[in-house]
Every structure is written in C-alpha cells, then in structure tokens.
A protein has these predicted regions:
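Short alpha-helix capping/helix-loop boundary micro-motifs
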Residues: 39-43
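Residue-level recognition of beta-strand microenvironments
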Residues: 6-9, 13, 46, 81-84
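A structural micro-motif recognizing beta-strand termini
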Residues: 30, 44-46, 60, 82
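A generic local secondary-structure boundary/capping motif
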Residues: 14-17, 44-46, 66-69, 92
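C-terminal structural segments of small proteins and small subunits
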Residues: 56, 62-96
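N-terminal first-folded block
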Residues: 1-37
Length: 96
C-alpha cells in the first residue's frame, strides 16, 4: 500500500468493457509529510475520492480484491480516503 494525493481525473470514452463505469483518477505518491515522493499512476477509484484528497492505494493483485475491481484489468486501486495520518503518536496530516 502507498499513500498518495489525487491530482487529476482520466476521461476515456473507449476502454476495455470491464472498465466501463469505473472512475479513473491520477494519483501522485507522497511521503508522510505530503510532499511528492516520486511516481504518478492512474488508479480505479473504489471509494469516491476527489481531486486534492490524500488516499491509500493498493497495487498489483491486491488491487483486484475489492468488489468493484475483482477480475478486471486493474493494477492500482484507491481503496481509502485518509482522514488522519499519525506517526509516532503525532498527527502529521488531518483532512481539512
């Protein structure tokens, strides 16, 4: 799993039929301070995240374990919206 921030949306009118109805988001991976950590991916959004939100992603076969993504050609899924990130007992991120 990796933490990222949704930075955009992908619109595709022609795609694999198994992806029809899936919301595609662009996610930039971030460190625990919210700074870019290198890496941008397109992910299927399973939780209704919006642009600017901090999210938790899963990749590889783990991305195909949600009811929305099972048996679909997906490599990365947004599986949670982060409300609070706590490191060593200190809150380093709180959702606005």
């Amino acid at each position: 799993m990796q933490i990222g921030r949704v930075i955009g949306t992908v619109v595709s009118t022609v795609k694999d039929e198994k992806l029809e109805g899936s919301k595609l988001q662009v996610v930039e991976f971030v460190d625990v301070n919210g700074k870019p950590a290198g890496g941008i991916v397109t992910a299927v959004d399973a939780v209704g995240a919006g642009v600017g939100e901090m999210v938790l992603t899963a990749a590889g076969s783990s991305a195909r374990q949600t009811p929305l993504t099972k048996d679909k050609p997906i490599d990365t899924v947004i599986m949670a919206i982060v409300d609070v990130l706590e490191i060593g007992g200190k809150e380093v991120y709180v959702k606005p």
